[in-house]
């Protein structure tokens, strides 16, 4: 990772799904469930939990992701991941903060 490149943390959209799925498969030992993690499954998840899932993006490329949802009382983080070459730069921390802020706003 270049130190001069900025990482944008923003809400995940379905347009990100392909890159997010590729990131999941890139990470050794990352568990993917065929039903929940399918395009249709993630689309349902994002509709139930708008604004709480985030991506980290560098130059249009997804380098991190958190799927985050809630049931009205309890928030839960799923699939917290950062691409191996981008770790130890605070990206995960920034994504967690963004998702927590969305949960606190009652998203």
Region annotations inferred by a language model:
Residues 6-20:
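A short beta-loop-alpha structural element at the N-terminal edge
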Residues 13, 83, 87:
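Residue-level recognition of the GNAT/N-acetyltransferase active site
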Residues 69-78, 87, 106-107:
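A conserved beta-turn-beta hairpin within the catalytic core of GNAT-like acetyltransferases
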Residues 88-101:
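Conserved acetyl-CoA-binding loop-helix of GNAT-fold acetyltransferases
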Residues 43-55, 76:
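A short helix-loop-beta-strand connector motif used in the catalytic cores of GNAT acetyltransferases and
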Residues 63, 101-107:
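Short, intrinsically disordered, charge-balanced linker/junction segments flanking boundaries
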Residues 55, 61-69, 76-81:
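Conserved beta-strand in the GNAT
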Residues 11, 21-35, 45:
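Helix-loop element at the rim of GNAT/NAT acetyltransferase active sites that forms part
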């Amino acid at each position: 990772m270049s130190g001069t490149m900025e990482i944008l943390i923003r809400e995940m959209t379905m347009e990100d799904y392909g890159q997010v799925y590729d990131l999941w498969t890139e990470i050794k030992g990352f568990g993917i469930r065929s039903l929940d993690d399918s395009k249709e499954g993630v689309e349902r998840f994002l509709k139930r939990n708008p604004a709480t899932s985030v991506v980290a993006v560098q130059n249009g490329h997804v380098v991190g992701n958190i799927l985050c949802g809630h049931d009205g009382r309890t928030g839960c983080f799923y699939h917290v991941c950062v691409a191996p070459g981008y770790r130890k730069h605070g990206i995960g921390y920034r994504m967690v903060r963004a998702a927590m802020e969305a949960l606190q706003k009652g998203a």
